[in-house]
Amino acid sequence: MKNTSPQPPVSKPRGSSLTRIVIWSQQLLCEVLEHGDLAVDLTAGTGQDTHVLAEAVGTEGQVVAFDLQAEALEKTTQRLQQHDFVVKNVPDDTEIKRAFGVYLVHACHSSVDKIITHPVKAIIANLGYLPGGDKSLVTRPD
């Protein structure tokens, strides 16, 4: 049976196309992820995506976020702690066991297969540079 309930008016999204795609990707992840899942943020940046993933997987889930810049991991830690998440920092060469919580790895996301050996439900990456950070550190294809 077709849903005939009134639909909210469709409005044109504001902001740049990049801003809209980030919001869309976060919404998609929230539709896919369930409490208890394992999710990965390949580029922690300011922690926005990491925070969305942590909310989506809940306290029973696990989020692993990577970044090359210590400044990015500090920003991510601050954002998550403001929302009462406990953050664990992991050395860049340590395999992460499947356990609850948010884990931050100071390493390139290219090491993901050495650090995470369990099935992952969702992965996100905002490639580029850290806003306000060192612009010489940018994700580029090999």
Residue positions per predicted region:
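Mobile active-site "lid"/loop adjacent to the S-adenosyl-L-methionine
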Residues: 124-142
